[in-house]
Amino acid sequence: MNQKGTVRLKALVLICLPLFLIATPVPVAVTEDDRQDRIESEAAEKEWANTLVSKVAQSNGTGTIKVSAPAKPTLRRMDNEEDEVISIECVYYDEMECEKSGDCEITKKTCYSEAHLKAVGCLAVFGLPTQEINSTEPYLKVDKPQYKSLGCMPYQHADSMNCENESSCRQGRSFRGGIGMCCCSTNNCNMPDLIEMVNPSLKKDSDNSALLWASTPSNMDLESLDKFPFYWIIIIALSVILCIALLILAYVGWKFQQNKKEEIKKQQKIKFDMEKTDALEAGNVPLVEPEEEMIEMVETPKELPITDFQLISKGRFGKVFKAQYTPDSGEKRLVAVKKLNEFQKASFLAEKRIFDELNEYPKWYKSIVEFVCAEKIGDEYWIVTEFHERLSLYELLKNNVISITSANRIIMSMIDGLQFLHDDRPYFFGHPKKPIIHRDIKSKNILVKSDMTTCIADFGLARIYSYDIEQSDLLGQVGTKRYMSPEMLEGATEFTPTAFKAMDVYSMGLVMWEVISRTKLHQTDEPPNYQMPFQVIGFDPTIGLMRNYVVSKKERPQWRDEIIKHEYMSLLKKVTEEMWDPEACARITAGCAFARVWNHIMSSPDSSEGYHSGSSMKNRGVDDVEQSEKPEGIEEMQHYHASSPSKRQHPSPNPFFDSCPPPPPIPVILENGGILQPDNAEPEPEELPDLPIVEKIYDIATNMLFSREELDLMNAQRQVEYEAGADTRASTPTPSGTFGTFTT
């Protein structure tokens, strides 16, 4: 053990030893108050039982037995939340009700403990036979004609009421008038086949001797009471000590992990400095060191060198501004500032965590929006990234049609960004990284640069996947409803990195459909107006509607005939369909999708033209592309990602040389900062916030899953129906958990 481990062990011993001495229990005797409480409790429960028997055993002139209904305990909840309510299901029968109304059916009822009688058991009162029975068995079954009353009774201690039996209701007491009584403590233990009486032949004086219950407990009961608290104090004290020890161990482990992370960061810093020195000596471009100090969030208000704010968009949780950023170097640049309110703090922290992770790598990947800083300014949370004048892919496609060459560059660059996020070792990065799950891929979260390449943005719902840490928050049903994968809509996601990545791939397939649908294939082609995926079912569909359409009916966005017949675009259509396959395990990965798109786009000899026809394409079959799982000739792409943005262009065909060049940027900004929308603009779909996982509880009565709120409401309704006499579950077992408190 090293020196640090020894210090930690000594500290743990010094902390635990005083706690152990303080919490060690000392034997204590029962106080007079405890003794008096025990006496009063037993007296109350025995008085209740004697009252019940006195009502049952009343002799008339003929010597027969007249039966009255037993005093059933009131079914109610305890007002004090600290009092535990115990419930039990017992068989119910009343001879008087049978004689009066003719309802002689044996039913079942649920009873609850109440007041100071903390427990409740099942009860049977029956008549003892007057004739001698020729049997040597100590206990005999009680026949139905002997039943006087079946139900339940509250009690304080099972031993004083002879309720220790669990499997059957066996006679423990007899009373004057030839009446026997038994008590048991499990559900339905007083069923007809389980009621037993003492053989009167073996105890002839049972009818003449009254075994009445005492009004005070015996000396043995008081002695057992003296010992009872001592054992419980030991158990409770040891439990407290164990909990404290576990908390201390957890804290020590957490501190150890923090120290370990700091040591790893120091080693990475030393390694980075060595790599930077080697790069300078070799004459290469020096590596960029992550600016960790600049992006640390502070709780105190501070100012950023950002001016000239111009509103771009706003929503329920924040606003996005175009602004001018002037760092210490004095070189001004346009940035996008996303200002979030307090309700979106979790989204801010999640996005900042992703950018912190990406900022630790030696270089920034060009298919991810470039990060500037993240700060808390006043009561707002700011995320500052690079600004792109073409705004989002959604804005571009909604207002313009594009050429095939523009579509090629858009599709290639956005899938390039997704494969970078997902893969441990991306194609053109050269460094290992942790997988990142975006969880909200859509056309609004993909920005279009001036050269028609794209970058992925908005990481408020993204998570870093760690193979050695369980992350239950990845199972939440989050994202934009119309872009949710079938398994997300169905709530049947596997807890594997492949399954989480497949959800992003599905969403990216829908974005590819949006791009291809707005692509002009030839001079006379007229693409239809922009439509969001699944717009046929409404602008703001519910989760249930999406589940029925996508999961049950397996519907997908429809292709227009021109796309299906077009030889070049039909292969991109096939890749898209493989990305939105209903089965998550059958979808291709983002890396595979990029390889197929790259090989298809870069293999066309006439890809630099504005439009493609079947005759101008290289005759390349789909099967040939499917066999190429890795991009071919990717040296240009590697150089592109290794260079600065201004030194090398994207290796895909340049859309600005097309006969149908890209549309100009969107400069339509009003004086108040809002984007000018056309008159027939569609309403924006709502996004689902990152909600916590809803606990689902199984209800046996309905064989369905419900939330705790739904189940509490259902439980209250059942209780009202029961108290009103509307219970119709006669002769059938009441499902466990139907009454009382539901637990998971």
UniProtKB/Swiss-Prot annotation:
Residues 48-253 are extracellular. ATP binds at I312, S313, K314, G315, R316, F317, G318, K319, V320, K338. GO terms for cellular component: plasma membrane; receptor complex. GO terms for molecular function: ATP binding; BMP binding; transforming growth factor beta receptor activity; transmembrane receptor protein serine/threonine kinase activity. Disruption phenotype: RNAi-mediated knockdown disrupts tail tip morphogenesis resulting in retention of the pointed larval tail tip in adult males (also known as the Lep phenotype). Residues 731-744 have a biased composition (Low complexity). The chain crosses the membrane at residues 254-274. Residues 275-744 are cytoplasmic. Pharynx, intestine, hypodermis and body wall muscles in L1 through to adult stages. Also expressed in head neurons, ventral cord and tail neurons. Subset of head neurons show coexpression with daf-1 when dauer/nondauer decision is made. The keyword Nucleus does not apply. It catalyses: L-threonyl-[receptor-protein] + ATP = O-phospho-L-threonyl-[receptor-protein] + ADP + H(+); L-seryl-[receptor-protein] + ATP = O-phospho-L-seryl-[receptor-protein] + ADP + H(+). Gene3D superfamilies: Phosphorylase Kinase, domain 1, Transferase(Phosphotransferase) domain 1. PANTHER family: RECEPTOR PROTEIN SERINE_THREONINE KINASE, TRANSFORMING GROWTH FACTOR-BETA RECEPTOR TYPE I AND II. Belongs to the protein kinase superfamily. TKL Ser/Thr protein kinase family. TGFB receptor subfamily. This is Cell surface receptor daf-4. It comes from Caenorhabditis elegans. The gene is daf-4.
